[in-house]
Amino acid sequence: LLGALALGDIGKHFPDTDEKSQGISSIKLLREVAYLVNKKGYEVVNIDSIVAAEKPKLKPYIDEMRKQVSEALGIEIENISIKATTEEKLGFTGREEGIKSYAVVLLKKI
């Protein structure tokens, strides 16, 4: 969302050197980013995302994740896609050293 509006990266807005950023909820960060998007005169239309992780298996959590994102952004849950995948034991995610995600968003000028 920040990149779509050339607002810099997450570290610009929530630096890891700032104590307020330590341990902060990702949903709280998303709400604050949504505020910046709206302040810039845009709204989120939809999100299509993929989370790559060997473990944990995310399928049991997808519906709740969609609900949380929907509430944080103030958009319908039907407009949020979260898909889980593995990388078949390849790379750092395949070695269970981390998780990564990708997202494509559609924004509309309001």
Language-model regions, residue ranges each:
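RNase III-family endoribonuclease catalytic core
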Residues: L1-E64, A72-L73
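Short glycine-rich loop/turn motifs that provide flexible caps or phosphate-binding loops at active sites
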Residues: L2, L7-I10, K83, L90-T93, ...
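A generic structural signal for well-ordered coil/turn residues at beta-strand boundaries
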Residues: V45-I47, T86, I99-S101
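Short, conserved loop-to-beta-strand elements that form functional interface hotspots
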Residues: D48-A53, D63-T93
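C-terminal edge-of-domain segments
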Residues: T93-I110
